[in-house]
Amino acid sequence: MRFTSEQLLEDGVLEREFTLGEIPGTLWTTPRSAPAPLLLMPHNNGLPKADPRLVARGRHTAAHGYAVATIDAAGCGERPRSAADEQARAELRRAMRAGEPVDEIFESFVGPLVENAAPEWRTTLDALLELPEIGGPVGYAGGWTALGIRLAVTEPRIVAAGFFAGGYVPRAQREEARQVTIPLLFLLQWDDEGNPRQRALDLFDAFGSKEKTLHANLGGHLGTPAFEAEDAGRFYDRHLK
């Protein structure tokens, strides 16, 4: 892991850009006398790690005593998409304009994205936990639920997860959800135009966790109330501090 820039922000948060091989990422930390617990904050849908909403979440969470990391997966930020990914997305746009079913198209490119991103996140986690200022435990706090399910099942260092029911979850991850046993907070926007409500409720029901909490709020995809950040903070404090 090589740090390429750093900036001390007004709230005392240190924001550092890093590269790990071909993986670009951002790490937010604050000065602490002891190593900080770590929150992984993945994103997808082509968003860059510099997306303002993601950066605001990272800084806010770090200011409350966590180390927070995000990376650009393939196809996000400046990382190129594969030809197959570009073709699938073009077909998705065509099908949506025509009002045709899109599940199989989502399946064709979201599944491979998860398969490719999970090893990169494990590599990133290995490198982050070697830093003296980070000691764990580790939580998942990303909007990319499909990736979170895969990591919650395959990465024992992750001990709690917060998911947002706002994107397509491939069949493989819907099956894997039954193997998720860590404490779970699941956010659902009741009127999310891109995520069928019943499918999200079925996914919540499938999770095998004995401690799982569903927070449902009225509104569309971008309408999550600000107070959910406070509730999420209490959830992570219980399990990571």
Language-model segments: what does each one mean?
Residues 115-179:
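Primarily recognizes the serine-hydrolase "nucleophile elbow" in alpha/beta-hydrolase
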